Amino acid sequence: MKAMEKDWYQKNWTLDIHNMSWVEDTNRQVDFLINQLQLKGTEKILDLACGFGRHSLEFARRGYDVTGIDITPAYIDYANEQAKKENLNAKFICQDIRTITFDKEFDVVLNMADGAIGYLEDDGENHKIFSVIAKALKNGGKHFIHFSAENLVRHSRAGMNAA
């Protein structure tokens, strides 16, 4: 992500995370994911563009081994503090998701609330995310994308088809 774009993102997306109405839906959303993905509780989960870790933390509370990645330092700091405070099996890494290098380590990869897909400069950047996902998933792994606003997801189709 270019410096100017990263600065814009930090300024406009670092919000008061505790006063978001959608935070209340987290338990219901995790229940839905467990049901739809037919999870058993032993899966290793990667949450891309995890924000402050609301889904990651809830999965960890339910016994899953979770890794969350986000580019916003304040969100990652908060998520790591919560995981430590609650003694959860979750780790959070501050990094651009296009640059992570996992190799068939995860049973599930999540892109919740778009997970950065469609917010990037062009289809090539979206393709990088799908390449990361393909490399991170174990054989037979599952990928779930939640598109929160179709009109915000400009470039997702080409990336999905190319991965």
For every predicted segment, state its role.
Residues 56-99:
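Class I SAM-dependent methyltransferase SAM/SAH-binding core
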Residues 110-112:
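A conserved beta-strand element that flanks and buttresses the S-adenosyl-L-methionine
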